[in-house]
Amino acid sequence: MKKIWIQIKNISMSPTASWDDIKTQVLTERELLSNYLVFIAAIPAISGLLGLIFMGENFFRAVFWAVLFFGFALLGVYLTAKVMNFLATSFNAEQNTQTYFKLTAFSATPIFLSGIFFLIPPIYGLSLLGLYGFYLFWIGFHRIVICPREEQFNFFFISLIAYFLIIILIFLLPALISGTAVYQGIL
């Protein structure tokens, strides 16, 4: 657990050095998922569960939302990596799902950490601090993705759009499917 907090601190406070370190790490998708991602993705799921219960939501509906959110969060990181890997050839970039999975997982850190604000629904707006994750995505992209310089911005921009849309779906779908959208201010 201490290693996770060190990684969170490093990626948040020293992103350039952290990305250089991440680039050299040999992490399988399974290792990254089980040793890092499940823990940070649990933060908004658990915070949202407690926040929904606090606001008077039905316990089982809140649990259903939390399970959906957690699953969609993990799936979203995985899908973003797969989309980037698929798009890579269009931009003459290296196809390497492992690199794209590291990029999306570690850049999602502030997005998932900002989920702590789900604990108190009236301050959901502070979860916008998670937008720092898109900055980390920018820094990480230029540090770990192998792509010709002339194609780099285009590949980054298309990848960012895909990442952004998938993040929006991660946040919307669980609320809509579980019926908690009213409590979360979506409907």
Spans of features found by a protein language model:
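N-terminal juxtamembrane cytosolic/stromal segments of multi-pass membrane proteins
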Residues: M1-I46
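Structural motif marking the loop-to-transmembrane transition
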Residues: M1-I8, R30-N35, G56-V67, G71, ...
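Interfacial aromatic "cap" segments that immediately flank transmembrane helices
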Residues: D20, V26-V38, Q95-F118, Y135-I167
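Perimembrane helix-loop junctions in membrane proteins
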Residues: D21-T24, G51-G56, T89-A93, R143, ...
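Short charge-dense sequence patches
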Residues: E31-N35, G51-N58, K82-A93, F164-I168
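Membrane-helix interface segments in multi-pass membrane proteins
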Residues: P44-A73, F118-G130, I168-L187
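Alpha-helical transmembrane segments with an aromatic anchor "belt"
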Residues: E57-I116
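Membrane-cytosol interface at the C-terminal ends of transmembrane alpha helices
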Residues: L75-F91, L128-V145
